[in-house]
């Protein structure tokens, strides 16, 4: 399969740089996976598309203020984007500077250069950095870090982003990008869903910066997926199995919930799904057989991204690309702060290979 098969024309004006005033106030494009039918509405329509006993699976990761500015002790400016917290003093990070720091280099971090750190080692594209500070890493990041807005949001982060670029149910710090489908859920909608009898469960996948990396190969099968840490605990497994047993649907909120659940299914032996704790590099594209998910809530994704490939594997390639063309024509807002889709599974999608 060619990466170019997943491109589409997107006017810059449709890229959302700020969220809606109300989280649940965005538009919702619904795609019936079986026949490709499209319906236009608002996000709160989701309440009427779900049935009592259906299970919504959310990702409860919390975005950390992972972007830090500073300079090398030798003088050059540096930008650090924390990819993963290793312990209370060390992180793995992407580093941008005119010249990459060498092991043993001292760094002065923060807008006021008040935090000292040392570059310990390089691991492929990531740098291991140790903070020389009495505070735990998370406290340091909360003090000097900036919210890591995606590269297509062409503006500096603002204080408001610390709340807006965070789901209302986030619990476990560790992500450097928000699970953006979840940004549309506010407390009134969550209450209404519970009152209707919709079940909820929470996985954790700490979204890494790799989610924004372009696919740099021509052929999809040649792409090497980045690793992200995921947790699917026993209570989620029990909720999924109970949902399936009563004939209801498992609905993933966001592609990160999809990847978590499908990773847990792949790791299971002699059962549909089992607890999963570890790194996942699952890469879902047309031809993949979904094992757990029946419906999906998701935002609109970048052209030629692994995420539009995941959606195509779920809804069918033709249905997906036609839906995106319609979304552009109807001027839906795209990407992290944009509008949403509700998609039901296309049972024939795995057999639809583009090209």
Swiss-Prot record:
Catalytic class of the enzyme: transferase
Cited InterPro entries: QueA, QueA_dom1, QueA_dom2, QueA_sf
Single GO MF descriptor: S-adenosylmethionine:tRNA ribosyltransferase-isomerase activity
Location in or out of the cell: Cytoplasm
Keywords, comma-separated and alphabetical: Cytoplasm, Queuosine biosynthesis, S-adenosyl-L-methionine, Transferase
Catalytic activity: 7-aminomethyl-7-carbaguanosine(34) in tRNA + S-adenosyl-L-methionine = epoxyqueuosine(34) in tRNA + adenine + L-methionine + 2 H(+)
GO biological process: queuosine biosynthetic process; tRNA wobble guanine modification
EC numbers, comma separated: 2.4.99.17
Coiled coil: none
Role noted for this protein: Transfers and isomerizes the ribose moiety from AdoMet to the 7-aminomethyl group of 7-deazaguanine (preQ1-tRNA) to give epoxyqueuosine (oQ-tRNA).
Family: Belongs to the QueA family.
Protein name (Swiss-Prot/TrEMBL): S-adenosylmethionine:tRNA ribosyltransferase-isomerase
């Amino acid at each position: 399969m060619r990466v170019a098969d997943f491109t589409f024309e997107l006017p810059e004006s449709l890229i959302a740089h700020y969220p809606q005033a109300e989280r649940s106030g965005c538009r919702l494009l619904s795609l019936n996976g079986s026949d490709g039918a499209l319906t236009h509405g608002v996000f709160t329509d989701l309440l009427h598309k779900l049935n009592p006993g259906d299970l919504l699976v959310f990702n409860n990761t919390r975005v950390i203020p992972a972007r830090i500015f500073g300079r090398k002790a030798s003088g050059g400016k540096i930008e650090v984007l924390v990819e993963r917290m290793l312990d209370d003093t060390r992180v793995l990070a992407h580093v941008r500077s005119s010249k990459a720091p060498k092991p043993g280099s001292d760094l002065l971090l923060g807008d006021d250069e008040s935090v000292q750190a040392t570059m310990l080692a390089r691991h492929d594209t990531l740098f291991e950095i140790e903070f020389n500070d009495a505070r735990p890493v998370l406290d340091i990041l909360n003090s000097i870090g900036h919210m890591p807005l995606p590269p297509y949001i062409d503006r500096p982060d603002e204080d408001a982003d610390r709340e807006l670029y965070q789901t209302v149910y986030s619990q476990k710090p560790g992500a450097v990008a928000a699970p953006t489908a979840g940004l549309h859920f506010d407390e009134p909608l969550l209450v209404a869903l519970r009152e209707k009898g919709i079940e909820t469960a929470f996985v954790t996948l700490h979204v890494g910066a790799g989610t924004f990396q372009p696919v740099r190969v021509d052929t999809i099968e040649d792409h090497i997926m980045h690793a992200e840490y995921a947790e699917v605990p026993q209570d989620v497994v029990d909720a999924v199995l109970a949902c399936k047993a009563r004939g209801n649907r498992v609905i993933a909120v966001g592609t990160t919930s999809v990847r978590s659940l499908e990773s847990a299914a792949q790791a299971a032996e002699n059962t549909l799904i089992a607890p999963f704790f570890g790194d996942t590099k699952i890469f879902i594209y047309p031809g993949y057989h979904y094992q757990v998910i029946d419906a999906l809530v998701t935002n609109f994704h970048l052209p030629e991204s692994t995420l539009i490939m995941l959606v195509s594997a779920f809804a069918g390639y033709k249905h997906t690309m036609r839906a995106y063309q319609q979304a552009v024509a109807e001027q839906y807002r795209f990407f992290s702060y944009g509008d949403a889709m509700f998609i039901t599974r296309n049972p024939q999608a795995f057999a639809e290979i583009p090209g």
